[in-house]
Amino acid sequence: MIGPAFLKQGVRHTDLGPIGDYPEGEYMVTTFVSSNEGDVARRTAFIRNNGFLGSQPSFTILSNHCAHLGCPVQPNGAVQYKQVSTFPGVTRLPVNPSGFGCPCHGGQYDTEGNRIAGPPVRALDRYSFSIVNGHLMVGKPFSVAYVIGLGAGAKIHVAKYSFPGEPVSGLESWLYPIQPPH
């Protein structure tokens, strides 16, 4: 009877509040609970409102898990420890990062999540998102090989979601051992 424990384990979209709560061009360290399991399912993401791309709102939503070993990445630069929490279950801290860094092994990322130094093998993972009734909904994470450009006009080279340490492009991605499904 192990089977039922593994049913319905898909990622649900989580409501992060009205898009107006995210100032254009500014990153917010956003902490949210991604399911009904409570605090054990708490996630943190770096969210920037990029304004509009055509007629659609554009957001950059970076995971805070380092692409090296999964340690928590921190913003490099000043953090305003003024908590902004206007939506239930969602906590936001405004930041103005010059990039992001991993304190564990020194991995460094630029403001688009590209790896710029240290041992990580790829860019920071991102979350998919949608806008429903004017609210930002965060969805499944996905891996990124690299990003060219900035903000709404950035070209994201998407890869299937991979564990930390797994290359997602180049020869290394073909040589890496096959991983179990996630």
Roles of regions detected by a PLM:
Residues 92-152:
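Short Fe-S-cluster ligation motifs
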Residues 1-91, 131-182:
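N-terminal pre-ligand scaffold of iron-sulfur
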